[in-house]
Amino acid sequence: MKLPIFIADAFTVTAFHGNPAAVCLLESILQEDAHQQIAREMNLSETAFIRKLQPTDSFSQSSCFGLRWFTPVSEVPLCGHATMASAAVLFHKIKNVNSTLTFVTLSGELKARRAEDGIVLDFPLYPTFPQDFHEVKDLIKAAIGDTTVQDIQYSPDTRKLLVRLSDSYDRSFLESLKVNTEPLPGIEKTGKVKGLILTVKGESGGQTTPYDFYSRYFAPWVGVPEDPVTGSAHTVLSSYWSQQLGKKEMRAFQCSCRGGELDISLRPDGRVDMKGGAAVVLEGMLTA
């Protein structure tokens, strides 16, 4: 087995920032268990597999492909940064001639289009609903201790729990917050929660780039203690903060140690555009 493989850093224009994802190009159907074996070998938060939908398709000429994502332990239904990485590989390395690519995925058809200063992902927008604190208090206590919480929301479509911290906290507090993810899968094992979003309101003005909101994302349930920059979490965050701020256009920053930023635009059709950069940092051949 020989497969072209790449690593691209998504939601950044600078190598070694953003969120790295491995991208495999599949000329033909891959044995099912090989997807997970390769993802485990790559040991990144996600490995993406792009496959041709028809034998006559071409990675440089076709505009529609199949796409799957795997963490080191399981397949996931949606991954933003690995979709961004996949589009970057096709656009920048394979020199795909199309301006827009369509990916057929477990979350339906997702589109990625070229932009002058990056790549725009067309993703679903998922609503949130108020979550009873007492149902998740043990989970939150284990994760962030006595940190003051302002709001708790739940996204049933993505099984993500959104925890908004007090507006008295700023970006530096969120960045330095020690989050204990190890016990979380043992505390919440009903399957209701598969990801924890922590978020704070942004600041305007000042000497630094203004962001509308900041976040961090944790998914120990699928083998990812903390994800550097998470497109799928922003399908939830965009819905929540748009309602809170009364805005359709927002800029977001994910406060992991690598960091990454997204330009967000809520669309009239109920979906969300997320724009970011990507840097391909490795290309080679997987042999097994």
UniProtKB/Swiss-Prot annotation:
GO CC terms, sorted: cytoplasm
Family matches, as InterPro entries: Phenazine_PhzF-like
Gene Ontology MF term list: identical protein binding; isomerase activity
Amino-acid biosynthesis keyword on record: no
Keyword Isomerase: yes
EC nos: 5.1.-.-
Gene3D superfamilies per record: Diaminopimelate Epimerase, Chain A, domain 1
Keywords carried by this UniProt record: Isomerase
Family designation: Belongs to the PhzF family.
Protein name, UniProt field: Phenazine biosynthesis-like domain-containing protein
Organism: Rattus norvegicus (Rat)
Gene name of the record: Pbld
